[in-house]
Amino acid sequence: MEWDSDSEGSGDEEEEEEEEEEEGVEVGGGGDGGVGVGVGGGFALAIEGVLGACGLVVSDALEPDFPIIYVNRGFEDATGYRAEEVLGRNCRFLQCRGPFAKRRHPLVDTTVVTDIRRCLEEGTVFQGDLLNFRKDGSPFMAKLQLTPIYGDDETITHYMGMQFFNDSNVDLGPLSVSTTKEIVRSTLITPDNTIRPSPMGKGFCSEHSDLFLLSDEVLCQKILSRLSPRDIASVNSVCKRLYHLTRNDDLWRMVCQNAWGSEATQVLETVAGTRSLAWGRLARELTTLEAVTWRKLTVGGAVEPSRCNFSACAAGNRVVLFGGEGVNMQPMNDTFVLDLNASKPEWRHINVRSAPPGRWGHTLSCLNGSRLVLFGGCGRQGLLNDVFMLDLDAQQPTWREIPGLAPPVPRSWHSSCTLDGTKLVVSGGCADSGVLLSDTYLLDVTMERPVWREIPASWTPPCRLGHSLSVYDGRKILMFGGLAKSGPLRLRSNDVFTLDLSENKPCWRCITGSGMPGASNPAGVGPPPRLDHVAVSLPGGRILIFGGSVAGLHSASKLYLLDPTEEKPTWRILNVPGRPPRFAWGHSTCVVGGTKAIVLGGQTGEEWTLTELHELSLMFPTLNQKDLELYSWKL
C-alpha cells in the first residue's frame, strides 16, 4: 500500500504541532491487540478537524497489495472518488493525477513513499504530509497517519489511514487525458443519476446504467472477472471500452481461475509454454476445443523389460510409469520417468528406495506437484490393498508406505482419483474369487494416522471394474463405464453416475445409463459401452471419453464429450484431425497439465513399444508475440 507523499517538514511546523498538542487528540498505535486513541503527541489533530474534513480509509493487510475495504464520506467529498471506484484498489492511485493516469506524478516525493513502505514492512505507525490528487486532477496536501490494526493473535490484519486535507498551491496546468479514455468518459449525467452519451461518445457504451461510472479496476476485479469465458467473449463486443478491457491478460487469468478453480490454473501454469501463452487464447481453445488434434511422438530411452497392465500418471510435465505385468505374469515394481520438458525426452529408470512389492492392475495417481500415490493391484501373493507415496523431487526418492487404518478389501482393476491434493478416493474393482465391488473409500494421506473412510450411501451403482473416476467442479466425482454386474451377467457399461463429496450426506446420482431402470439417456449419441477407457477432465467440468475395450473392437478412437454441470447433459462427438492411436487404454494414458493426454505405446501381440506416443493436444502450438497480439476472441 503506497500513499502520495511529499515530506517538507521543518522546525516551524514542529513548533506549530507542539502548540496544538494541548487541545488536540492523537490517533496512534494503542499497544497490543489494536488501535489506541490518546491526547497530545507529535501528530496532534484539532477536534474541529476530526469532526470536519477527515478522510478515513481502511485496507486489508492480509490480502496482496493491501486493497481498500472501506472509505468514509469525508474521503469521497475531499477526493471526488466514490467508494465503488476505490474499493479493491491500492491507495497508490492517489499518487496519480486524474482517474486514468498510470504513473506516479513527478512532484510526489519518492523518499516519503519509501518511508511509508518501510513502516508497512515493520508494522509501525507512519505520520507525514502527502501530496495527493483529486479525481479532477487538482492537487491537495494531506496530513496522514497510517496505523496498524492487530487481530487476536497479534497479527496485523488491517491498516487505518486518517487524512486531513488542505488545498495545494502547486501550479500543474490543465489535466491532459488520452483521446480514447476522454471519449469513454464523455457522458452527461442526468438528474436521475443515469448516463446519457454525448455526441462525441459515438461508438462507445450507450447504456443508461451506472455500471459505466465504475473505474476500469472495479469493472475488471469485481464484475468482469466473475463471468465465464463465453460471457467475457460476448461482453467484448458491447463497446470499445469493454473491448479494450477484455483484451487484458490479467483479467483473463482471473476469469479462468474463477471458472476453473485455482488448482486447475496452477496446474496449467506448470506446463511448458503456458506462461508465455495468452490466457485469453488458452480460455478460448479449452472452451471451444477448436484446437484439438492428434500428434504422434517418438521418444528415446526404453522401458525394460517389456510389460503390460502397468499404471501411468503425470506429475507436472513428467510421465511416471510404475510396475506392470511382465513375461509369465511376473509382477514388476520398477519406476520410470519421461520428462516432456526435455529437449529430447527419453525414458529414464529411477533408482528409488523401498520399492513396493511388484504388481499389476493397480492405480497410480498424482496428489499435487511431485507427489504420487499408489494403491492396490495384484502381486505375487495375490491381491493388495496397501498404499505407498513417492516424492519425485526428493533428493533421494523413496516409496513410503502409508499405514491406513480400516482399509478396504484387497482389489485390482479398481479406479481412483485424488481430491484437494491430499485425499485418495478408491472405487470398485475385483476382489478375491473374481467378486466385483461397488464400494467407495476415501483416505487423507496427510494425516498423522490416516484412517480409511467408506463413503456412506443409501444406494450405490452396480458393482464394476475397469471404470473411470473423474473429478469436476471442486469436489464432485463422475463415474463412467466399466464391466458392470447386471443380474447374473457382466456387461460393458456406458452408465454415468455422479457423487458430490461436499454434501453432508453424499449420494450417487444416475445421469444416464442404458442398463439402469428408469434412467434417462441424454441428448446426442452416447459412447458405446466400454471398460479400461480414457477419461480426461477438462477445465470447467467437462469430461472427454475415448478408447478402451468395446465389444467387437480393440479400442474405439471416437472422442465423446459430456458436461455434467448442464441442466440436461448432452453427449457430443468431437471430430479430431490427425492420426489417432490404434489402441488407447485408461491404465496407460495420462493427462498432462489439463492441456493434453499422452497415450503410451502401440501394441503388437503382447509386446508394448513405449517409445511411441500419441498426444491428444487441446491447444495450438505456441504462437509468436505478433500472432498473440492479433489473436482475438470470437466464439
From Swiss-Prot:
Residue ranges occupied by any F-box domain in the UniProt entry: 209-255
Pfam families on file: F-box-like, Kelch_2, Kelch_KLHDC2_KLHL20_DRC7, PAS_9
GO biological process, one term: circadian rhythm
Gene3D superfamilies to which the protein is assigned, alphabetical: 1.20.1280.50, Kelch-type beta propeller, PAS domain
S-4a-FMN cysteine: residues bearing it: C91
Top-rank taxon, per record: Eukaryota
Signal peptide extent: none
CC terms in the record's Gene Ontology section: cytosol; nucleus; SCF ubiquitin ligase complex
Bias-annotated ranges (Acidic residues): 1-25
Keyword field contains Cytoplasm: no
Kelch repeats by residue range: 371-421, 423-474, 476-530, 542-594
Protein name (Swiss-Prot/TrEMBL): Putative adagio-like protein 2
Organism name: Oryza sativa subsp. japonica (Rice)
